C-alpha cells in the first residue's frame, strides 16, 4: 500500500472480473460472452473504418449511433446515451442520480459492481435480500429513499423480473430514479424500454457485449426520458467527452442494424441453454430458471468449488463465487452447442467419480 494513495484508494474493494485465460484450448464459460462472432456486416464496417480520419477525434455525442438505437427502440435521439460499456454508464448513473445522504437499494445477490460504485461515491446503500428461490421481493424496493437498481435478468442467478413487477417498483418510487440493468434482456426477457414514455424516473441500461457479440469493443447505452439523459451527459462531460472511438461507433451501428443475424444468434443461445438445462437435470443438478445467456447450478451432495476445480483441470472454465448464500453454486455461460456437449460430458465424468 503506497503512502501516496488517497483514503478512498486505500479502502476501496475493487470489482474482480472473470478470469481471462491465455490458453486458447480452454472452453471458456465464465464471463458470459457470446459464443458466436459479430455480424459479418460489423466486421466489414471495422475494415472500412481503418481510414486516415482516425487522426481526428470522434463525435463526442455519438449522434449517428444514438439515432440508430433511437430508431430501433422507437425513441428520440435525445432519449439515448452512449457509454464505454454499460459498466461506465452504471458508474456515471450512480454519480448522476444518487445522493450520499440517501439510501440506494439493490439486491444482496446481484452485480458485484454496485457496492463498488456506492462505496467509491460514499453512498449509503441497502441490500434487499432475495428469496430462497433467488426471486426479488418487490416490497423491499418500496419507497427507496435514494433510488433503486435492478438487474433484469439478475446476475449471477439469471432470474427474470416481470414487467408488471418493474412497473410496481417504478410507481413505488416516483420521486427517485430506478435503474434497470438489462445486460442480458435479449435472451428471453421482456425489456422495460416500453415503459419509458410513462415513467420519467426509469433509466434502462443495456450493452452490446452479450447479445451483439461486441464485448471486445466496449459499447453500452442508456435509454430514458430527456432530463435523465441530460444529467448523464453533464457527468460524462466532466470526465471525458470522447468515450467512444470511431471504429467502435461504426461497428455498433451495423450491429444494431443487422436484426436478422442478432435474432439468429440469440435464438441459438436460447436453444442451447434449454438443452443444457435439460441435460443437467438428468444427472441431478438443480438449475435456477434463467432468461440470460448463462445458468446458475448446484448439486446437493457435491461442493461447487470442487466441481469448479475439476472442470478447470479438464480445460473447462466456469465461474465460482465464494460468497454467502451462493458458495455452492456455479455460473455457467452458454457456449456453442459443441462446447456445451463437451461441458456436459466432462461434468458427467466428474460427478461419476466423486
Curated annotation (Swiss-Prot):
GO terms for biological process: L-histidine biosynthetic process. Keywords: Amino-acid biosynthesis, Aminotransferase, Histidine biosynthesis, Pyridoxal phosphate, Transferase. It catalyses: L-histidinol phosphate + 2-oxoglutarate = 3-(imidazol-4-yl)-2-oxopropyl phosphate + L-glutamate. The keyword DNA damage does not apply. The modification N6-(pyridoxal phosphate)lysine is found at residue 210. It is an enzyme of class 2 (transferase). CDD domains: AAT_like (cd00609). One of its GO terms (molecular function) is pyridoxal phosphate binding. Its EC number is 2.6.1.9. Transmembrane segments: none annotated. It holds the Pfam family Aminotran_1_2. Pathway: Amino-acid biosynthesis; L-histidine biosynthesis; L-histidine from 5-phospho-alpha-D-ribose 1-diphosphate: step 7/9. Its cofactor is pyridoxal 5'-phosphate. The keyword Thylakoid does not apply. Disulfide bonds: none annotated. Homodimer. Belongs to the class-II pyridoxal-phosphate-dependent aminotransferase family. Histidinol-phosphate aminotransferase subfamily. This is Histidinol-phosphate aminotransferase. It comes from Clostridium botulinum (strain 657 / Type Ba4).
Amino acid at each position: 500500500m503506497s503512502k501516496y494513495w488517497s483514503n478512498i484508494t486505500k479502502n476501496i474493494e475493487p470489482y474482480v472480473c472473470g478470469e481471462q485465460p491465455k490458453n486458447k484450448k480452454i472452453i471458456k464459460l465464465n464471463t458470459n460472452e457470446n459464443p458466436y462472432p459479430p455480424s459479418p456486416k460489423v466486421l466489414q464496417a471495422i475494415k472500412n473504418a481503418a481510414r486516415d480520419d482516425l487522426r481526428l477525434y470522434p463525435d463526442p455525442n455519438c449522434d449517428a449511433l444514438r439515432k440508430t438505437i433511437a430508431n430501433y427502440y422507437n425513441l428520440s435521439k435525445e432519449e439515448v446515451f452512449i457509454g464505454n460499456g454499460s459498466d461506465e454508464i452504471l458508474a456515471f448513473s450512480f454519480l448522476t442520480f444518487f445522493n450520499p445522504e440517501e439510501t440506494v437499494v439493490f439486491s444482496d445477490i446481484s452485480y458485484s459492481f454496485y457496492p463498488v460504485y456506492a462505496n467509491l461515491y460514499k453512498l449509503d446503500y441497502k441490500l434487499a435480500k432475495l428469496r430462497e428461490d433467488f426471486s426479488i421481493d418487490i416490497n423491499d424496493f418500496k419507497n427507496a429513499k435514494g433510488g433503486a437498481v435492478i438487474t433484469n435478468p439478475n446476475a449471477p442467478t439469471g432470474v427474470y423480473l416481470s414487467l408488471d413487477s418493474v412497473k410496481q417498483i417504478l410507481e413505488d418510487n416516483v420521486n427517485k430514479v430506478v435503474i434497470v440493468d438489462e445486460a442480458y434482456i435479449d435472451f428471453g426477457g421482456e425489456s422495460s424500454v416500453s415503459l419509458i414514455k410513462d415513467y420519467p424516473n426509469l433509466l434502462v441500461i443495456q450493452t452490446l457485449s452479450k447479445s451483439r457479440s461486441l464485448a471486445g469493443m466496449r459499447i453500452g447505452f442508456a435509454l430514458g426520458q430527456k432530463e435523465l439523459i441530460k444529467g448523464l451527459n453533464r457527468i460524462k462531460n466532466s470526465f471525458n467527452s470522447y468515450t467512444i472511438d470511431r471504429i467502435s461507433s461504426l461497428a455498433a451501428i451495423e450491429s444494431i442494424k443487422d436484426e436478422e443475424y442478432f435474432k439468429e444468434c440469440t435464438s441459438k443461445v436460447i436453444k442451447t441453454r434449454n438443452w443444457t438445462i435439460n441435460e443437467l437435470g438428468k444427472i441431478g443438478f438443480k438449475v435456477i430458471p434463467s432468461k440470460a445467456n448463462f445458468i446458475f447450478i448446484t448439486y446437493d451432495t457435491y461442493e461447487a468449488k470442487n466441481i469448479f476445480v475439476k472442470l478447470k483441470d479438464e480445460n473447462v472454465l466456469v465461474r465460482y463465487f465464494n460468497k454467502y448464500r451462493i458458495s455452492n453454486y456455479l455460473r455457467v455461460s452458454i457456449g456453442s452447442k459443441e462446447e456445451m456437449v463437451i461441458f456436459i460430458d466432462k461434468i458427467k465424468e466428474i460427478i461419476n467419480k466423486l
